Swiss-Prot record:
Phenotype upon gene inactivation: Seedling lethality with severe dwarfism. Plants develop collapsed and inviable pollen grains.
Protein name listed in UniProt: Callose synthase 10
Entry similarity comment: Belongs to the glycosyltransferase 48 family.
This protein's record includes keyword Membrane: yes
HAT repeat start and end residues: 100-132, 1074-1107, 1659-1691
InterPro entries documented for this protein: FKS1-like_dom1, Glyco_trans_48_dom
Amino acid sequence: MARVYSNWDRLVRATLRREQLRNTGQGHERVSSGLAGAVPPSLGRATNIDAILQAADEIQSEDPSVARILCEQAYSMAQNLDPNSDGRGVLQFKTGLMSVIKQKLAKRDGASIDRDRDIERLWEFYKLYKRRHRVDDIQKEEQKWRESGTTFSSNVGEILKMRKVFATLRALIEVLEVLSRDADPNGVGRSIRDELGRIKKADATLSAELTPYNIVPLEAQSMTNAIGVFPEVRGAVQAIRYTEHFPRLPVDFEISGQRDADMFDLLEYIFGFQRDNVRNQREHLVLTLSNAQSQLSIPGQNDPKIDENAVNEVFLKVLDNYIKWCKYLRIRVVYNKLEAIDRDRKLFLVSLYFLIWGEAANVRFLPECICYIFHNMAKELDAKLDHGEAVRADSCLTGTDTGSVSFLERIICPIYETISAETVRNNGGKAAHSEWRNYDDFNEYFWTPACFELSWPMKTESRFLSKPKGRKRTAKSSFVEHRTYLHLFRSFIRLWIFMFIMFQSLTIIAFRNEHLNIETFKILLSAGPTYAIMNFIECLLDVVLMYGAYSMARGMAISRLVIRFLWWGLGSAFVVYYYVKVLDERNKPNQNEFFFHLYILVLGCYAAVRLIFGLLVKLPACHALSEMSDQSFFQFFKWIYQERYFVGRGLFENLSDYCRYVAFWLVVLASKFTFAYFLQIKPLVKPTNTIIHLPPFQYSWHDIVSKSNDHALTIVSLWAPVLAIYLMDIHIWYTLLSAIIGGVMGAKARLGEIRTIEMVHKRFESFPEAFAQNLVSPVVKRVPLGQHASQDGQDMNKAYAAMFSPFWNEIIKSLREEDYLSNREMDLLSIPSNTGSLRLVQWPLFLLCSKILVAIDLAMECKETQEVLWRQICDDEYMAYAVQECYYSVEKILNSMVNDEGRRWVERIFLEISNSIEQGSLAITLNLKKLQLVVSRFTALTGLLIRNETPDLAKGAAKAMFDFYEVVTHDLLSHDLREQLDTWNILARARNEGRLFSRIAWPRDPEIIEQVKRLHLLLTVKDAAANVPKNLEARRRLEFFTNSLFMDMPQARPVAEMVPFSVFTPYYSETVLYSSSELRSENEDGISILFYLQKIFPDEWENFLERIGRSESTGDADLQASSTDALELRFWVSYRGQTLARTVRGMMYYRRALMLQSFLERRGLGVDDASLTNMPRGFESSIEARAQADLKFTYVVSCQIYGQQKQQKKPEATDIGLLLQRYEALRVAFIHSEDVGNGDGGSGGKKEFYSKLVKADIHGKDEEIYSIKLPGDPKLGEGKPENQNHAIVFTRGEAIQTIDMNQDNYLEEAIKMRNLLEEFHGKHGIRRPTILGVREHVFTGSVSSLAWFMSNQETSFVTLGQRVLAYPLKVRMHYGHPDVFDRIFHITRGGISKASRVINISEDIYAGFNSTLRQGNITHHEYIQVGKGRDVGLNQIALFEGKVAGGNGEQVLSRDVYRIGQLFDFFRMMSFYFTTVGFYVCTMMTVLTVYVFLYGRVYLAFSGADRAISRVAKLSGNTALDAALNAQFLVQIGIFTAVPMVMGFILELGLLKAIFSFITMQFQLCSVFFTFSLGTRTHYFGRTILHGGAKYRATGRGFVVQHIKFADNYRLYSRSHFVKAFEVALLLIIYIAYGYTDGGASSFVLLTISSWFLVISWLFAPYIFNPSGFEWQKTVEDFEDWVSWLMYKGGVGVKGELSWESWWEEEQAHIQTLRGRILETILSLRFFMFQYGIVYKLDLTRKNTSLALYGYSWVVLVVIVFLFKLFWYSPRKSSNILLALRFLQGVASITFIALIVVAIAMTDLSIPDMFACVLGFIPTGWALLSLAITWKQVLRVLGLWETVREFGRIYDAAMGMLIFSPIALLSWFPFISTFQSRLLFNQAFSRGLEISIILAGNRANVET
C-alpha cells in the first residue's frame, strides 16, 4: 500500500509540474515553482493561494515546518472556496497539494506535530525572517531616502530580491492573521493579534510593494520604483490632491490604497465611475501633467509644483475638440473664459473628460457624442462643486433605493445598446450600408443643434436612441453609402468635368484643323452646356444618393440639395437653350449675334463669380478673409458653393506649399494634354472623317445601329480605347514626375550617401561628431565639451568619440544578441570607451586590423628618412591611428605592469624614442628591421595577460617580459643607446640579481584590461576586415544608421524633457513563438521550419550556436536536452519569422535605448549612482534609468482573446506569458468575458465583458492591474479597430506609434526616437503635425524572387512614394502601422482607426482621412525606419492585394473620401484621388482598355466594317491606337510601377546596381508578376463596388517555399484571372480568324502582343511562380488531387477545399441583391455577341444576313444541350430503364454524327465551320451559365439547378485541362524545373544558399 501511495504522489507531482512547465513556456525566465504555478484560475482570482504557496516554496529550505503550515492553510482556503471541487482543475490541485502536505509530514520521521503551536512557530519564523533580511533597516533607509527626495540606492537585482522578501512576508502575515482567529483569545492569540495590528499599521512598505500598479505606484508609495520621487510626478500628484474648498466626501467613502483623497475620488463619488477606470485615468492625468511640466522645466526637489502653463497646455489640448464643437454649434462652453477658471477647475474638467473617455467603450468612436456627454456632465459638476457636501449626480442615478450611481449603466449602456442593435441589421456584413446606421451616422447626429433634443439625462425615446424594429430601417444621418460606381463621379466631380471638357476642347481644336478663329471659339463654347449638364448630373446624384437619410438629415442640408438641384437644372436648360440659339445664329448669315454676346456675358459673369468664390474658399491667402466675413449674402453663396460640415473646415495649406503642388500638377497636366492631343486625339481625326463620309457598304451580319447612323459603332470602337487611355494615362505622368521629384528630394535629404560597408569604413571618423550633433542632448554635450573647450581638435574628437562609443557598442551588442555577428566580429566592431588617459581617439579594430603589420613592413623596407616613412603611413589615416595607439598603449601597459628598475627602463626607452621622433632621427635610434621580432615578443606577453592570472601564468609573463626587454635592448636599439643601458648601474644590478621583471603586476584596472585585449588583437589579427560584418542584414542596418547621422533631424532633448510616447500593437491569434514541435514538423517534402532556416541563414545559425556555447556539430537532440537552449532555439526561429515575439523584442528596444540615454545623461551630470558607472551594462541596473524610461515609454499589446486563450490553455497564451516575464515593461490588454447569473441564482443568461490590463509579477505570473467593465461585447464592427479601442485607454504619453504584429525594430533606430518625436514641435506648414510618417524596411525580400518583387514594390511606396505625398503634395494619409500619432489629438477625435463593419475594412487609412478632415497635418520622415514583414508567396500576395483592393472599393463609397474629394482644392484633390482610390480606378481602366479594344476589333471583324474601311482609314497602323495600346501595355507589365522602384535603386544603391537590379527583375519575369497583380486588383476592386463582399483575408505569414497544389491555385484564381484570361484569348482568336489586315495573322499578333502577354500571365503565373511547379512527380500528384476535388460531391458541412460543388456554391455568395443580379445580367449579355457574329461568318450561311439565321443557331444549341442532358442523365432505379437509356444514347449519337457527315457532304458546311460553332457556343453557354447562377432561386424553383451545376462542372473541367496541359508537357523536361528554381530563387542562389536542398526536400536525409 505504501508503494501505491508513493507512486500516486509521484504521479500527481509530475502531472502538476508538467502542467506548470507547459504554462511557462518550457523554459527558464521567472517561473512560479512548485504548486504555485498550478493554482486553478477559479481559486487564484478570489484568494492569495498562489502567493502563499509561492512563499512556501521560497522558505522550504529554511524551515520545512513553516512551509507545511502554509501549504495546509492554502488547502483550507481552497476547500472553503470550492468544497465540491466543481471548478476546472480544482480536484487535481487539491489532490496534489494534499500529497505535498503528506510528504512533508512523512519527512518528520514520525515526530508528532502539535498544531496548537503552529501559530507560535509561524510567528517566531516571521520575526527571524525579518531580521535575516534586514527588513526594518531597509524600511528606515527607505524613509531617509524619501525624505531627501531621491530614490532608494539599489540596483535591479537587489530590488527583485527585496520584492520577493516583501511578498513572502505578506503571505506570512496573511496566514498569521487567519490562524490567530482560532488561537486562544487570552493567550498567544491575543498578543499575536495585537502585534499584527501594529504590523499592519506600521508595515505600509509591505502592501506598497505588492499593490498592483501600472507605471506610477499612486495607491501606495514604493521603494523599488523611482518614478514616484521624480519632482514632476510628485508635483502632478500634489496638483490633483483634495483641498479644503472641494465638497466634502462622506465619511464612509473608501479611499483605495494608502494615498490621500484627490479630485478623482470626488468624481467617482458624484458620477459613479468604475474604481479601476478612476485608477487608470488618475495615473493617465498624473503622467500627462508631469510630462507637460518636464518639457517646460523640471521642478525643484523641495515642494515641487506644476506650472500654470503646463496645466493650460494639457487643458487646451484635451478639450480642443470640445471647444471647436461648441463653436461650431454656437453654444457656450462650460466655462466663461480661460482666465476666469482656476487651476483646480481646469484639472477637474480634464479629469472628467478622461474618465468619460476611459469608460465610454465603443462610444469612443463617437467623439462628438463624448463632447455632448462631457458638456452636460461638466455643467452638472460645476453645480456640484458649489456644494459643501459631495452630492451624487442625478443623470447617473441607477434608480435603486440605495441612491447609487453608475456612469456606465446610465449613460454608456443605452448608447451602446442602440449601436449594437443596429449592427445586428448588418447581417454579418452582408446587408447594404443603407440598411443600418454605422458609427459615423451616430456621431454625426451630434453635428447639429438637434442633438440637444436628447436632453439630459438622455431621453430613451429619442430618435437617436431608437432601435430598429423589424424590417423598418432607421434613417442615416447625412450620408448614405449606396453601393454604386457613381460615387466615383460624385466624389471627384471636378476632376471628371475638367477631364471631359479638356477632351471636348482638344477634340474640337483637332477637328477644326487647329484653326483658332471665331468659329472655332463658338464651338469651344459648347463646354458651357457640358459643364452645366455634368453639374446637374452631380446634383441629381446628390438627391438620389441621399435616399435613406432625409428623415434624419439637417433641414439646411436638404435645402441646399434642393436649391442646387433647381439651380443647375434651370441653369443647364438655360445654357443649352442659349447655346442652341448661338448655333442657329452661326448657321444663319447676317445675324447680329445677340445670343452669342448674351451667352458670353452669362458665362463670363458666372465664371468670374465662381472664380472669386473659389479663390476665397480654396486659396490659402484668401481663406482667412472669407472666414472673417459675416455678411449673410456672402455666407449664403459660400454655403451653396461648399457644404459646411463639422469636419473638413480649413482644408488649406500655406501659400508656398500651395504653389508647390500646383506647379507639380501643372507640369503633369501639360505633359498629359500634350501627349493626348498629338498622339491620341489628332491622329484619329482623319480616320473618323473618312468613316463618317464612307459610302454605304454591305455589313457581314444583320446590322441594327451603324448602317443608318454614319457607322456610329465603328467610330465608337475606334475612339473607345483611346478615351479609356485618356482617362487613365494621367496616372502615368503623375508616376513619372513623382519618381523624379522623389529622387531629387531623397538626394537632397542625403539618402544613399553611405550605401556600402566600404563607405562605412571610410567615413567612420566623421560618425562620432555627427552622432553628437544630432543624437546627443545638449545637456550631455555641454559637460564634456566644456571641459575641453580650450583644447585642440584632438581632444574634441576624443570627447565626441567618448559620447559615441557606448551607443555604438550597445548597437553592436544588439546585433550580436540577434546573431547577425559572431563574437570575433563583435570584438572587431566594438569601439573603446575613449574615456581613459590615452591621448588619442581609439577606433574600432575592424578599421585598424592588419594596419600595424603593414606599417611594420613599410618600416622594415624603408630606406628613406623618418618623415618619408611617416608620410607613407599617413596615406592611410587609420594606419596612422593604429601606429599611434599601439605606441601609447604599449607605454601605458608596460608602466602599469612593472615597478622600480623595470619602470625606469620603460621610462628611459620611451623618453629616448620620443626625443628621436622630435629630432627626426628615429631610423638612427632604432633598428627598424627588428620590429617584427619585437612585436612577436610583445604579443607573446599580451597573449598571457589577456587570460586570468595563475601562478604559472605569472611566471610565464615575467619570462615573456624579460624576453621582450632583451629583444628591445639588444636588437631594436642602436649601438650607442644599447651600451648606455647595459652600463646603467641600477638596471645592471637588478638584472644580475634576478630582480629585473621578476614580478609582474597583473592587469586589474578595467581600462588596462581593455587596452591589453585590444592591443593583442591589434597586433595579431592579420586578415583584413573589409568584409566585417559579413552578414547582409547587419551591413544594411549599419549602413542606414550611419547614413542617417548626416540627415536633417531635430535636436534631441534630454530624456527627462522628451515627448513621452506609447507603442501599441493589436494582436489576435497569430504566431507568438514557434513551438518545438512546429520547428520540427515537416511538410510533404520533408522540410521543417528549422531545417529551412538553417539553410537560408547559415551564418546566423553558426552565430547562434556560438552564442549559446555549442559547437557547429550540435544536433537538435542536444539542444532539446537543455530547456534553456531549447527555449533560446524557439526564440531564434521566431525572431526570423513574422511573429509577435519578434515585434515585442523590437519595440522593447525603445526602452533599452531610453535607459541607456538616461543613464549616460545622469552620469554626465554626475547625479547617477557612482557604483554603476563602471559596470559593463550599468544602465540596465540603474533604477533611475529604468524609471525615467518607464515615465517616457509604454508598450501595450492588445491581445483581444488572450483571456479565452488562457482558459483554453492555448500555446499562444503560454507564449504571451513568457514574453511578459522576459520584458517587465510589457503590458498586455485583453477582453475578458464572464457568464453571469440570470437573476434567479442560476448560471447562464448573459455575459459581462471586461477590458483588462496585466503585467508579470515578481514570480512571473499575470498580475491584473486594471479591470474595466464594458457595456457589452465590444466587437460590433471589423474587430481589429475595437481591439485597439478597448486597449487604447491603457496607453500613455503625447504620442502613440501603431505597430502591427508583423513588424520589427532595431536598437540603432530606437536611439533616434527622441529626435522623431520632436517633429511634433517642428514647422511643417500652417499646422503642427498630427501624424508622423515613418520609413519602413521590408525584411522578407531576401530569398525568393516574388518576395523581392513585393518588397521592392512596397519599399518604393513607403519611401519615395510617401516622400512625395507628404511634400510637396501634402496628401499623405496613414497607410500602415509604423506611423506615430499625436495621441491626445486622436483619442479626442475618435481614435486611431474607424470600426464600422465592411465600409471600414481598411481601418487604418481612415485614421489618416479623419486626421486630415479634422485639420491635422501628416508628414513623412526617412532618417528613422521600422522593419516590416510582407507576404512572400504568390497566393499570400494575391490575398493581401485582394484585401487592399476590396478595402479601396469600400473607400469609394465612404463619406470620408467624398468629403475630401469635395473639400480639397482642385489640385490637392487630384493628388488625393490618384494616390488612393484613383490608383485602383486607373488599374481597372488598364484592363478595361484591353476589353474595349478587343471587343471593338471583334465588332469590326464580325460586321465586316474592317474590310470595308481598312484601305481608306488605315486603322491598323494608326498612331493614336498604337499610342493607346503601348501606354496600356507599359502599365500592364508594371513599367510604371517599376519607375519609382528604379529611382529608389539609383538613390540608395547607385546607378549601375540599379540598372543591374532592374534587368535582373525582368529576367525573373517581374512583368508577369505585375500583370498578374493587375488582374487581382481589378477583380477585387470592381467586384467590391458591384457586390460588396470585402473582408479581412488571413494571408498567413509563415515561411513559404512549399509547392502549392494545382487545385488550390485553380480555386483561388479561377474567377479572378482564368475566366477573364480565356475570354480575352477567345477575343484574340476570333480577331485573328475573322479580322482583316494586309499583313496577315502576324500583324494581328504584333498588334495584340500586350493582350497575349496578359492571357499568358493570368493563366500561368500561379504555376510559373509555384515552387516545384514543373516537377513531374508533383504534376502527377496535382492532377490526381484536382480530379478528386472536381468529382467529389458536396453537401452540408463539406468545405470548398474538398469538393468542387461546395466551392462552386461559395463562389456565388457575393451575388446577394436584386441590383447585383441586374448588373451581372447586363455584364453577361456581352457573351452572346460571339454566337451572333460567328453565325454570319460560316461558309454555310454565305452572305445571308437574315435575323432568322441567328434563331436557327439557338435551335442547334438547344439540341446540343438536350443531347448533353441525355448523355449525362443516369437513372438510379430500374436496370431496364438503364438499358433503354443506353440504347437511346447510342442511337442519338449515331444519328448526330451521321447528320453532321451528311451536312458536310451535301451542304456548304465545312470543317472550319464546326470549330467556329464551338467558338460561338462556348461563350453563349458561359453566358447562360452566368445568368443561371445570377438567378439561382428561379432555376431552383424550375428544377434545373442540377443541370446547371453539371454544366458548370464541365466548364471548370475544360478550363482546368487547358491550363494543365502545357504544365504537364513542360514537366516532361527536367531542365525546365531547374530553370524555374533559378528563376524563383535567384536571390538565394546569389547568396550561395542551399536552396536546391530545400526544394529537393529532406526526406532522403531523414530516411538514410
